[in-house]
């Protein structure tokens, strides 16, 4: 067996090195996105140093202060911080500030990046300034997040120092499983005899044959690797080479002759040639997901290596090629992510919108104002279409519209929830913690709770097993009856963790008539209009109950995974035994992103 096209002994060493770097990365300054290190005010000069998490290349850090009369001047008293130096062995940078001011009483820090705003306001107390020697903060300083259109006053509350603890047993298990899943995921990349950068959906070649590179699966898998390259594995050359290999394979397939003669070709052979058999094509979510992954990689790569030539010469043309395609085809029918229904799909539109929004920012940074404008306006038009998928009479999101062929189904589908995890951009638009996603989560879960025998008489520590959609007949290697999918169950756990993170960033959450069925599951006293404010016992209890529910989904994954941590595509709806493709790459990638979300640090 080979890994990274190297003999087993060498590749095993590389994977072990990968794991050891993850352990050592725990010594980075803080999990906060922005945190004060130290400051000094001598009566005339105010200066300091700030830890800034390197989320993207383009960022802005500002110190906002009240003057000697404790007047904020409508938050007009500002000092711009500037980049100073990277912090070795971490994904943090030092930023510094210095200004001559006549007087200062208190201050806080604002960090703007990728459409989000983070704050360090010293747990809502702000930093109180005295004329003294330099003062250093402790690692307990925390960060709050806010929508990109932030207010002119500091946030009223700070994010708690700890994410809800959930189930400690599951916390221990998932860290172990995360390592197993990472190894399995990497094992499916560059298998022997394949073209450089080939990411197999599974190494299974019969019963079923999944030994192909699906554009979607490869992009979502690489997105996980990019996130780690940008955070816990910053600077890791092995992982960088894996990502560059993925780019090489992907760029080649962009120009490969295919049956659909378009970028929406779903899958490719191990030698990077197009699959020519009958299939549901095109699948237009793939180019959008690939562009998103390429953009995240471009930002991280440029920050870490300062090598602009690779970004402008290789990544930029590929990104623009994919997104130009999305602009031209987004309103056309195509096959869904399950490859079974031809129509217009909620999931596909969500990942398209995300790719275009990131692409607009990327184009602007790269001097292409025309594309930036086109991508932005198209994303806005797509958002209007996405909103039409909400069916108020059902209180859930319809999965598809304008269906012209394929499987007939009522419209409930777990992909609408995966779209929130994978296709939202932290702007409140169908995000995991938004009311319509929460309502749909209740409806989808309820549909499987009564359908699958495995969900009958569940012990209290388990969550419901979740499939793709209730009418599913694909059994993993043919047609009879659908089963639970590991990535659907971990997707539910991730959705819950992301929702909690979102509410913390927003200072709380208010129940609406739409989301009430969700909140009733975790607080019997919930009513429409009730607000759970961060820092209150009501919010803490709610967050902990939802985290425990997420952990019950992970307990279900733990129960049905193989003893060695292997995760197939599915597990049987009656017996609970694994079925379908062995060690599905997407199953393992989904487990890893759920683990990050459980730790309060969801992937981009």
Curated annotation (Swiss-Prot):
Region (Starch degradation): 116-604
Region (Disordered): 127-164
PANTHER family tied to this protein: GLUCOAMYLASE (PTHR31616:SF12), TREHALASE (PTHR31616)
Catalysed reactions, as listed in the record: Hydrolysis of terminal (1->4)-linked alpha-D-glucose residues successively from non-reducing ends of the chains with release of beta-D-glucose
Name of the protein this chain belongs to: Glucoamylase 1
InterPro entries on file: 6-hairpin_glycosidase_sf (IPR008928), 6hp_glycosidase-like_sf (IPR012341), CBM21_dom (IPR005036), CBM21_dom_sf (IPR038175), GH15-like (IPR011613), Glucoamylase (IPR000165), Glucoamylase_active_site (IPR046966)
Binding site for substrate: 279
Signal peptide: 1-25
């Amino acid at each position: 067996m080979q890994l990274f096209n190297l003999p087993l002994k060498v590749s095993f060493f590389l994977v072990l090195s990968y794991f050891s770097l993850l352990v050592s990365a725990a010594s980075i300054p803080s999990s906060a996105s922005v945190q004060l290190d130290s400051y000094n005010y001598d009566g005339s000069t105010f200066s300091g140093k700030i830890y800034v998490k390197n989320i993207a290349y383009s960022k802005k850090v500002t110190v906002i202060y009240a003057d000697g009369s404790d007047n904020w001047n409508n938050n007009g008293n500002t000092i711009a911080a500037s980049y100073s130096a990277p912090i070795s062995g971490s994904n943090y940078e030092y930023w510094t500030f210095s200004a001559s001011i006549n007087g200062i009483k208190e201050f806080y820090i604002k960090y703007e990046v990728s459409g989000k705003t983070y704050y360090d306001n010293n747990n809502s107390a702000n930093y109180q300034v005295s004329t003294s020697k330099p003062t250093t903060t402790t690692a307990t300083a925390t960060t709050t997040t806010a929508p990109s259109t932030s207010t002119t006053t500091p946030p009223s509350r700070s994010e708690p120092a700890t994410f809800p603890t959930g189930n400690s047993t599951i916390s221990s298990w998932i860290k172990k499983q995360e390592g197993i899943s990472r190894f399995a995921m990497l094992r499916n990349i560059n298998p022997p005899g394949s073209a450089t950068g080939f990411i197999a959906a599974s190494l299974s070649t019969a019963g079923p044959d999944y030994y192909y590179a699906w554009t979607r699966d490869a992009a979502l898998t690489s997105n996980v690797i990019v996130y780690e390259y940008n955070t816990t594995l910053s600077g890791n050359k092995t992982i960088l080479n894996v990502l560059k290999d993925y780019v090489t394979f992907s760029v080649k397939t962009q120009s490969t002759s295919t049956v659909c003669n378009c970028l929406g070709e779903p899958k490719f052979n191990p030698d990077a040639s197009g699959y020519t058999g009958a299939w549901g094509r095109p699948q237009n979510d793939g180019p959008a997901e690939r562009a998103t992954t390429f953009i995240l990689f471009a930002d991280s790569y440029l920050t870490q290596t300062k090598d602009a030539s690779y970004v402008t010469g290789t990544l930029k043309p590929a990104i623009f090629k994919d997104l130009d395609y999305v602009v031209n085809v987004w309103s056309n029918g195509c096959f869904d992510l399950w490859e079974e229904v031809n129509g217009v799909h909620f999931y596909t539109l969500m990942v398209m919108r995300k790719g275009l929004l990131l692409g607009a920012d990327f184009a602007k940074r790269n001097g292409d104002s025309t594309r930036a404008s086109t991508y932005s306006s198209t994303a806005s038009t797509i958002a209007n279409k996405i909103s039409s998928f909400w069916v108020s009479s059902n209180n859930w999101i319809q999965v598809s519209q304008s269906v012209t062929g394929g499987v007939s189904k009522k419209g409930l589908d777990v992909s609408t929830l995966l779209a929130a995890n994978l296709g939202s951009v932290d702007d409140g638009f169908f995000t995991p913690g938004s009311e319509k996603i929460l309502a749909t989560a209740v409806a989808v879960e309820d549909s499987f709770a009564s359908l699958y025998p495995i969900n009958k008489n569940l012990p209290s520590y388990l969550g419901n097993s979740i499939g793709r959609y209730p009418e599913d007949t694909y059994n993993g290697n043919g047609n009879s009856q659908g089963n639970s999918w590991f990535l659907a169950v971990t997707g539910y756990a991730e959705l819950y963790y992301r929702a909690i993170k979102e509410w913390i960033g927003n200072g709380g959450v208010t129940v609406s008539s739409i989301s009430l069925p969700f909140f009733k599951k975790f607080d019997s006293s919930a009513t429409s209009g009730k607000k759970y404010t961060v820092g209150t016992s009501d919010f803490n209890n709610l967050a902990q109950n939802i985290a425990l529910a997420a952990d019950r989904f992970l307990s279900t994954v733990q129960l049905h995974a193989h003893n060695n941590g292997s995760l197939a595509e599915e597990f049987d709806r009656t017996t609970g035994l694994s079925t379908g493709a062995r060690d599905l790459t997407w199953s393992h990638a989904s487990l890893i992103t759920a683990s990050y979300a459980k730790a309060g640090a969801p992937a981009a």
